[in-house]
């Protein structure tokens, strides 16, 4: 892709024409390879493929326009289905279920329609860095059988703004 093509894609709204769907950062931080998550369920992509984020912020937001599916009782993870039919699972940290909700506050509700950037869960990062096995947060696509192409991005990301994954169905 040349410079002009890249610039055109930045100012153009024809993403739907190309069939590319962008997954936006559900939290601020640094992208990490999913294979580096210290949990076999995520590292071996048992629940889906994607990326992980080492968080620096204090909230998880909707990474797509869509509908919140399940928010775990302990408020450490949620699922969302995008308007384009992509099913995503965002899971804060590893073994954070053992904290029984400590450090997490639910903002959104199950079944709620959300837009990219709408807050779903707030969290206390210093507390979770102290108590959780890991704060690496997997962001995975759980209906990979419907995905033709998955492009994982890298680098620092800003909650609700920076793309982390581009996919084609």
Curated annotation (Swiss-Prot):
One MF annotation (Gene Ontology) recorded for this entry: kinase activity
Binding site for Zn(2+): 76, 91
Free-text disruption phenotype from the record: In mutants defective in enzyme I and histidine-containing phosphate carrier protein (HPr), cells lacking this gene are able to grow on the non-PTS compounds such as glycerol, maltose, melibiose, mannose 6-phosphate, and alpha-glycerol phosphate.
Superkingdom, natural source: Bacteria
Residues recorded as bearing Phosphohistidine in the entry: 91
Keywords: Cytoplasm, Kinase, Metal-binding, Phosphoprotein, Phosphotransferase system, Sugar transport, Transferase, Transport, Zinc
Effect recorded for residue 4 to W: Same activity as the wild-type
Catalytic machinery residues: 91
PROSITE patterns for this protein: PTS_EIIA_TYPE_1, PTS_EIIA_TYPE_1_HIS
CDD domains: PTS_IIA_glc
Domain PTS EIIA type-1: 39-143
Cofactor remark: Binds 1 zinc ion per glycerol kinase EIIA-Glc dimer. The zinc ion is important for dimerization.
Any GO BP annotation: regulation of carbohydrate utilization
Entry cofactors: Zn(2+)
GO cellular component, one term: membrane
Positions of the record's site feature: Important for phospho-donor activity: 76
Location of the protein in the cell: Cytoplasm
Record note on quaternary structure: Heterodimer with glycerol kinase (glpk).
NCBIfam families given in the database record: PRK09439.1 (NF006962), PTBA (TIGR00830)
Domain notes: The EIIA domain is phosphorylated by phospho-HPr on a histidyl residue. Then, it transfers the phosphoryl group to the EIIB domain.
Protein function: The phosphoenolpyruvate-dependent sugar phosphotransferase system (sugar PTS), a major carbohydrate active transport system, catalyzes the phosphorylation of incoming sugar substrates concomitantly with their translocation across the cell membrane. The enzyme II complex composed of PtsG and Crr is involved in glucose transport. The non-phosphorylated EIII-Glc is an inhibitor for uptake of certain sugars such as maltose, melibiose, lactose, and glycerol. Phosphorylated EIII-Glc, however, may be an activator for adenylate cyclase. It is an important regulatory protein for cell metabolism.
Protein name stated in the entry: PTS system glucose-specific EIIA component
Gene assigned in the entry: crr
């Amino acid at each position: 892709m040349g410079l002009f093509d890249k610039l055109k894609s930045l100012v153009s709204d024809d993403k739907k024409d190309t069939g590319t769907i962008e997954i936006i950062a559900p939290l601020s931080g640094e992208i990490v390879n999913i294979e580096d998550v210290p949990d076999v369920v995520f590292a071996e992509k048992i629940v889906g493929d994607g990326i992980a984020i080492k968080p620096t912020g204090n909230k998880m937001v909707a990474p797509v326009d869509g509908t919140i599916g399940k928010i775990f009782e302990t408020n450490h993870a949620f699922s969302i289905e995008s308007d384009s039919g992509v099913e995503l699972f965002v899971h804060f940290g590893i073994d954070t279920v053992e904290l029984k909700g400590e450090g997490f506050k639910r903002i959104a509700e199950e079944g709620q329609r959300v837009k990219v950037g709408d807050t779903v869960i707030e969290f206390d990062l210093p507390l979770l860095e102290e108590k959780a096995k890991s704060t690496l947060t997997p962001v995975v696509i759980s209906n990979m059988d419907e995905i033709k192409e998955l492009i994982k991005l890298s680098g620092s990301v800003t909650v609700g703004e920076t793309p982390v994954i581009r996919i084609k169905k």
